[in-house]
Amino acid sequence: MSVVELEDGVYESTAVIDNGSFGTRTIRFETGRLAQQAAGSAVAYLDDETMLLSATTASKNPKDHFDFFPLTVDVEERMYAAGRIPGSFFRREGRPSTDAILTCRLIDRPLRPSFVDGLRNEIQVVVTVMSLDPKDLYDVLAINAASMSTQLAGLPFSGPVGGARIALIDGTWVAFPTVEQLERAVFDMVVAGRIVGDGDSADVAIMMVEAEATENVVELVAGGAQAPTEAVVAEGLEAAKPFIKALCAAQQELADRAAKPAGEYPVFPDYEADVYDAVASVATEALAEALTIAGKTERNDRTDEIKVEVLERLAEPYAGREKEIGAAFRSLTKKLVRQRILTDHFRIDGRGITDIRALSAEVAVIPRAHGSALFERGETQILGVTTLDMIKMAQQIDSLGPENTKRYMHHYNFPPYSTGETGRVGSPKRREIGHGALAERALVPVLPSIEEFPYAIRQVSEALGSNGSTSMGSVCASTLALLNAGVPLKAPVAGIAMGLVSDDVDVDGKVEKRYVALTDILGAEDAFGDMDFKVAGTKDFVTALQLDTKLDGIPSQVLAGALSQAKDARLTILDVMAEAIDRPDEMSPYAPRITTIKVPVDKIGEVIGPKGKMINSITEETGAQISIEDDGTVFVGAADGLSAQAAIDKINAIANPQLPKVGERFLGTVVKTTDFGAFVSLLPGRDGLVHISKLGKGKRIAKVEDVVKVGDKLRVEIADIDNRGKISLVLVAEESAESAESAGDKGAEKAEGAAADVTPAEA
């Protein structure tokens, strides 16, 4: 569809996404109406109900002292978008939600490499969620909105970038699925890319992928749905390309009509050619030798020594250009690493291209933790720690996403000492949030249902040592820790990071493009390579995937080969993990025991009591924690089984009542004394009377208070229940009680509230 001028200076373009029997979605871009003082602004609509405003601005002067590109992406969730007032104390939006931070990362990853190298002007992209249909997810629309506003801003940007979410539903890849449709999906992918080439040769270069198996994938596959294997994932990447092409075309049409003229922005190359030639002439031989050292610390120490020597030798002829010398040295290092891989299939640490570093796995490493594990892969070391608690400890989420609670929480920590450096510690940075979210998505598909395992689960991954893919190490450590905590996973999950190096290579006088996929990449191979490809999964299918590439597209056969390599590595890692633990352990004695019972919905109020009086009294008397859901599900947690059972019996006495019987015994509490006897609480709302004549053990007493007082515990037996339901009690002799217990007759005598469930009635 061509661009439409809605009014003077206001233009619109549209992309229609046809999903066949799953319906169509319409993405509309508009510019010229809102945020006109920004360098570029655009409003993106999804079916007219979901509306995002994106504004891109650039600083007037470059930060030439920076050695990086200062791009900032912010996503502002406005709660009015969903017709809600923020739940915070001040009733206004504060720090960004996790969803907003993850969306920032989704936008940044394909946008950043699309800017010209050497740009040092500060660029800020702000995406504001202004309206959100509850059936939609806004993150993918935000990628397109950010690309559109940046394309309009007249910046040195090689866009547009298109982003599409596709889900595998009933064997069909559906673009921009609704939340309801995603419940039927087995796999969900966000794919971003841009068009390369012209005319018939035009293709979509995939720049970024974020993918995951859905929460109910195991059940769907068992019911006959297609499993998300490596081959299926590769098909999904191809299926996303037509949708991305349509989105890029709509953006380009609007940019051709309304974009500002390209401005002149100075670029600051990291170094000039003369500096690189000088560095190469003095450092190549020594650096090539240093890069054969297998150990990371020793290798880094030696390359640092060489760098100092180079700076000293070139200090006089290249005075004042020390930063260029440092950048050229890094570029030379990158070239040597890549050349060795491409020509010799030999890596920095001496491994072959498919070799995995030494693996080790150990469980139960933290004494009082509910579950813990230590996973090591080479110099990458991850400690996983699992904590179990009541469902009421699930995270409460106040954001625009469809989730309002999260039962499984995965937190990733990356302290500076993990790389032998100093740095800030404290609240998590965006990278840590992103890595934790990736590991969380990898494990969610294999978690047991809340009915099977009624616990809130917090998983913490501590990166104690880092040299390549701590996020995938976190997946492995977390699987081990969860099993050690007794969590009945549907299947163990492992992860591996893949890399790619490509270049034109002279073979027998002919130049050909060569691609080499690397298994289990080091940190340096990640930095110097063309692709960072993280794959997690079970032995049967992929559960999570993340891809970032610096290339203009990766041939499908290369990607398929990398996926196959990743599966081989994953199976090897799973075997090592199985040697440490291959089934859920017994739960830790320090973990709470949680039992689930069901009560009628109309009895919830009685269980809670006025102002929580009843539920608080049960908690105080038994020591158990109690959480009640709106559907009548009650979670009872306690440090031991006896406390939990006592609480359950008290709840059942209120909500699922049964009449007590003559002869049943109780350990009751004296709640009232009178001239004629003592009233003893047997069950919530059910008291019985011990007559004064029965309190003296055969002796006459003048005053009830001489024998018992309010709060005393008495062992009593029901002697009679009259036709009005009044209960008469007698004391149980201690000798009798003890002999009954020693004989194993504990079923007849109950703790207070542990007898059958009765309807509260007047004693």
Curated annotation (Swiss-Prot):
Q: Where does Mg(2+) bind?
A: 526, 532
Q: What is this protein called?
A: Polyribonucleotide nucleotidyltransferase
Q: Give the Gene Ontology MF terms in alphabetical order.
A: 3'-5'-RNA exonuclease activity; magnesium ion binding; polyribonucleotide nucleotidyltransferase activity; RNA binding
Q: Where is the S1 motif domain?
A: 663-732
- Quick one: where's region Disordered? 739-763
Question: Which cofactor is recorded for it?
Answer: Mg(2+)
Q: Does the keyword Metal-binding apply?
A: yes
